[in-house]
Amino acid sequence: MTADELVFFVNGKKVVEKNADPETTLLVYLRRKLGLCGTKLGCGEGGCGACTVMISKYDRLQNKIVHFSVNACLAPICSLHHVAVTTVEGIGNTQKLHPVQERIARSHGSQCGFCTPGIVMSMYTLLRNQPEPTVEEIENAFQGNLCRCTGYRPILQGFRTFAKDGGCCGGSGNNPNCCMNQTKDQTVSLSPSLFNPEDFKPLDPTQEPIFPPELLRLKDTPQKKLRFEGERVTWIQASTMEELLDLKAQHPDAKLVVGNTEIGIEMKFKNMLFPLIVCPAWIPELNSVVHGPEGISFGASCPLSLVESVLAEEIAKLPEQKTEVFRGVMEQLRWFAGKQVKSVASIGGNIITASPISDLNPVFMASGAKLTLVSRGTRRTVRMDHTFFPGYRKTLLRPEEILLSIEIPYSKEGEFFSAFKQASRREDDIAKVTSGMRVLFKPGTIEVQELSLCFGGMADRTISALKTTPKQLSKSWNEELLQSVCAGLAEELQLAPDAPGGMVEFRRTLTLSFFFKFYLTVLQKLGRADLEDMCGKLDPTFASATLLFQKDPPANVQLFQEVPKDQSEEDMVGRPLPHLAANMQASGEAVYCDDIPRYENELSLRLVTSTRAHAKITSIDTSEAKKVPGFVCFLTAEDVPNSNATGLFNDETVFAKDEVTCVGHIIGAVVADTPEHAQRAARGVKITYEDLPAIITIQDAINNNSFYGSEIKIEKGDLKKGFSEADNVVSGELYIGGQEHFYLETNCTIAVPKGEAGEMELFVSTQNTMKTQSFVAKMLGVPDNRIVVRVKRMGGGFGGKETRSTVVSTALALAAHKTGRPVRCMLDRDEDMLITGGRHPFLAKYKVGFMKTGTVVALEVAHFSNGGNTEDLSRSIMERALFHMDNAYKIPNIRGTGRICKTNLPSNTAFRGFGGPQGMLIAEYWMSEVAITCGLPAEEVRRKNMYKEGDLTHFNQKLEGFTLPRCWDECIASSQYLARKREVEKFNRENCWKKRGLCIIPTKFGISFTLPFLNQGGALVHVYTDGSVLLTHGGTEMGQGLHTKMVQVASRALKIPTSKIHISETSTNTVPNTSPTAASASADLNGQGVYEACQTILKRLEPFKKKKPTGPWEAWVMDAYTSAVSLSATGFYKTPNLGYSFETNSGNPFHYFSYGVACSEVEIDCLTGDHKNLRTDIVMDVGSSLNPAIDIGQVEGAFVQGLGLFTMEELHYSPEGSLHTRGPSTYKIPAFGSIPIEFRVSLLRDCPNKRAIYASKAVGEPPLFLASSIFFAIKDAIRAARAQHGDNAKQLFQLDSPATPEKIRNACVDQFTTLCVTGVPENCKSWSVRI
């Protein structure tokens, strides 16, 4: 049977594909076939939004053109027949930016830029549907988009200028409702704006591209069945119900796909293959919406976005009593997923997928929704009850049946309904527990006639509490019923200690908490229905427990110092210059590694990794791999021409030989003609193992004495004397979990052999060109000078590409050497997370001695980190943790020790802060316990113990230019700390089940590589005869704005406009022997190198300037050229006077320190563990800022990354050492809605730093730790909750990091948690272990 042609439009151009493969996604087609690389691959599972595009089609049922956003990484091209696709390239370019592109660029909303095109397209789609959106609609548009760099504030602030309801004016003062005016401090004068909205192009909806007329002409043409055949899969697009039922009768195993949001993931990540896929999306009956007498019936193919809009309309016009169920469904849909998923995911698919943690199925089950099932010749209606899901991922449907529709019922008089969900993150997250709850009372009474309590996340399917609910019938809605239900649920809803998903006590407690919320909500509604006399009055302190999550309108302030009035307009230092690549990033023109056009004879590589934590390799079978079309070769350690040993300490291998030491250890690599064939072949490689004992956790390592190197120690004073003189001594321990970098662009390399003298060129996404070069050269057995490494830009790095990127690059270089052809590999997100390691988990055991006044006199901390299977940078990271164990406090008698645990996990590595945040969190943890034990305000104890100017640290470095007290006092004042503390106490008295916390935290962060010789930077400056300047330096651009700052430095040094200066890339053949772009020091080191090179040029131009004092610049340059004077210069800088000895505790490890203070307020839900970040005020000393926009962006971005570290991001490993959390669906980084509602950042004024270029300071890492103010505010709120339930206010309790909903809920001990205590049998292995 012949296949049909696929016809669709992309950016107005017609595309006819004669060989459409159902396995090809729109993303792959756009990038590889059409060369449209603006759309990015961030995760491949619809979780990050980097691949967002807009789809436009004529909707025959609504009789209109509709526009909606989709994830191109999940959309099969076969689903796009007769639609129009718009990508970021289709709406504007750098010659003429669309207003959406312009505003994100000019409001500084693009740092690394990898997420930017997807965010642009989400906003563009909103504006196509709603040219004048509200602020809330704008925020909701980004629920399916993630950004790891910016902290989201500048994106939202830029796009709020489109809003009709008080769009931000950016501080221009033209808006009477301006957020800055509303919250303006009296203590500091307002800065100029970071951007001026008046400069923005207005949005003109009439100028948008039209829907293709050819597609519009087809609207009345009957749709016909289509067939597309790929290499392994056939896709049939059914156009009528009859065709569909016939197909299902003939092929009962055929998969029905509408949005591909589930099947696509199963095929990609679970290696499932469905040879026949049938798409029923066109069938009218499956898309119909029917308003019946008992409810609204939705066809099974109706997208969830349509369900949402229909129910919203009904809720607006129907009586409240009739829409109880509708509002429950809407509450679940609110947090269900991003717009991209809801636009295509069908209501029927959501039901039939039968997920045990479905958001919607418990709601449908509790509501008694009716399902209509049809097959050829039969039709039946069933109620969705406990029998509908007979087992894991199973339904009552017969193989030949399909779901035709679902009827969501109207609620009756006396019926109440609520829906609940708790996840790690509110937006776009998989639930831990979901629930639908319904009660129907006998008319005019509070006696229960029907009660339905349904749950997801409590079994292998959606369940109903069938033992508990019948016992409540005919009971009155009162305290007695509450106790009965809670006892019943605790008994009925048991979970095994090793239940998949873990968090057993938390999940069990949530079922009771949800019912308690439902009980209170119903009680409240009964009171409004004049039944208060029967049921009793709701305690007013309980009322807030019934409130659904509401977010106040955001308010943001950014304060910075203006440049001097006499500064030349051409001198851009100190001005908020946008990132130089922002326009290219916003238009999709910025080129990342995988965007480089493919070579004609290019091959693709996929890694083959270990599935065991520690084992001998007994055999490798490649026979199945070789059968895959396009297979070229399989590489192992035997193929390495020179040295298989690699890594910073030669303790790693290019490929594992004989033995593997972690899950994810690279054993070999498959090379094939396409990425898809390479991946299939890699999965076909079968490896057998002989398991060896594995060490997974820090505790395992301690028990087995498994460490790297000797103990590291810093000691000062007389510890014994200090403890003996102390009034109080407190001991304890703190565990700090690891963190995944989650740069949006995964590791990527293209290796191109040059065919002579062993030369090779590598295009790499790396922070470390030098080590990439030397590791490849060593592996191949050639001198470094034969290997050129080039980096244009990275889509984020954060330390994750400092050393670990080399494991990919080295394998690629071997493949290119072996085949003699260019080879490319961009890791999939799950591979990247599995292989590359992350932030080190820490365990600290501390003992602190202090006086009754709160003065700390003695401290001892033993630090243990989980280093993983190789040493990598673990020792330097532990050293920095010890250097920062004091944070900002003078402790006369102190000892800090550090051990790095050698475990069978992927090697952990550098991550923004480099051990500093772990050391400082421990310091603030015991400091908070000192304050509690003394009964003193924490802020007083912190201030009392703080260093002063000229003090020596515990490692004997003198503090000079110590601005921290200024930052502290300014933050106390600008945050109105003392007044707000009283307000928090008042709120906590008035609310039993919601509590607020407030905390202020300082940071002191040392700037320099602690390995002295790394503190060097270089630059190369070429001046061309037209006066243009090409600048190269040793640092790489990963979104932090380094290139922009270097151009600003060169501009001031040469006294020419920034427009004359260009940076193309970083490469080993321009600036050699570079230090990694890390340690926050790159602007300092390379900036000074740039300055030196520019000075050399200026000296050479001096004679020509004297001859022509008025210039212009171009004349001096031409005169120098014609006089045969070199117009090329290098510059070099090394940081002076560095070097510390652990043996003698002397010398300076740091050139200077950066300081900052943050005050944060949170509100926790004691029943669910949920929290919201109400407000954060930050005062940061960045010296004389080179670029306030970039520096504020770094402060906000680092803070939000720290927010993830301390409250949200949690890695789950199995007891066998296998990572569970391998993508955005299971690993949650902060989203748009996670940031503080009020976010106020102030750069300290008048604090020039004499030790760095143009008096600036480092900013990349220091602000991250300030997010611990959120952690400690949460702990403050938990303490208030525990005090309410009988805990002594001075009683200490352990709260490990991150403070996830699970930890918050479990710490808020109450009558519900005590019912759900779950013992763990001795030999039971839990689902995940604390590594």
UniProtKB/Swiss-Prot annotation:
Q: How is its activity regulated?
A: Can be converted from the dehydrogenase form (D) to the oxidase form (O) irreversibly by proteolysis or reversibly through the oxidation of sulfhydryl groups.
Sorted alphabetically, the keyword list is: 2Fe-2S, Cytoplasm, Disulfide bond, FAD, Flavoprotein, Iron, Iron-sulfur, Metal-binding, Molybdenum, NAD, Oxidoreductase, Peroxisome, Secreted
Residues in the active site?
A: 1261 (proton acceptor)
Give residues annotated as binding substrate: 802, 880, 914, 1010
Q: Where does FAD bind?
A: 256-263, 336, 346-350, 359, 403, 421
Protein name, entry field: Xanthine dehydrogenase/oxidase
The UniProt catalytic activity note for this protein reads: xanthine + NAD(+) + H2O = urate + NADH + H(+); hypoxanthine + NAD(+) + H2O = xanthine + NADH + H(+); xanthine + O2 + H2O = urate + H2O2
- The record lists [2Fe-2S] cluster 1 as bound by 43, 48, 51, 73
Gene3D superfamilies the record matches: 3.10.20.30, 3.30.465.10, [2Fe-2S]-binding domain (1.10.150.120), Aldehyde oxidase/xanthine dehydrogenase, a/b hammerhead (3.90.1170.50), Aldehyde oxidase/xanthine dehydrogenase, molybdopterin binding domain (3.30.365.10), CO dehydrogenase flavoprotein, C-terminal domain (3.30.390.50), Uridine Diphospho-n-acetylenolpyruvylglucosamine Reductase, domain 2 (3.30.43.10)
Entry GO MF terms? 2 iron, 2 sulfur cluster binding; FAD binding; flavin adenine dinucleotide binding; hypoxanthine dehydrogenase activity; hypoxanthine oxidase activity; identical protein binding; iron ion binding; molybdopterin cofactor binding
- Lineage, top-rank taxon, reads Eukaryota
Q: Which Pfam families match?
A: Ald_Xan_dh_C, CO_deh_flav_C, FAD_binding_5, Fer2, Fer2_2, MoCoBD_1, MoCoBD_2
- Give the quaternary structure: Homodimer. Interacts with BTN1A1.
> Under which EC number(s) is this enzyme classified?
1.17.1.4, 1.17.3.2
Q: Which residues bind [2Fe-2S] cluster 2?
A: 112, 115, 147, 149
Q: Which residues pair up as cystines?
A: 535-992
Entry function:
Key enzyme in purine degradation. Catalyzes the oxidation of hypoxanthine to xanthine. Catalyzes the oxidation of xanthine to uric acid. Contributes to the generation of reactive oxygen species.
The family annotation for this protein states: Belongs to the xanthine dehydrogenase family.
Binding of Mo-molybdopterin, residues: 767, 798, 912, 1079
What coarse category fits the chief subcellular location reported for this protein? other
- Gene Ontology, cellular component aspect: cytosol; extracellular space; peroxisome; sarcoplasmic reticulum
Posttranslational mods: Subject to partial proteolysis; this alters the enzyme from the dehydrogenase form (D) to the oxidase form (O). Contains sulfhydryl groups that are easily oxidized (in vitro); this alters the enzyme from the dehydrogenase form (D) to the oxidase form (O).
Task: Mention one GO biological process in which this protein takes part, according to its record.
Answer: hypoxanthine catabolic process
| Start and end residues of each FAD-binding PCMH-type domain | 228-413
So which cofactors does this thing need?
A: [2Fe-2S] cluster; FAD; Mo-molybdopterin
Annotated organism of origin:
Rattus norvegicus
What does the entry's cofactor note say about binding and number? Binds 2 [2Fe-2S] clusters per subunit.
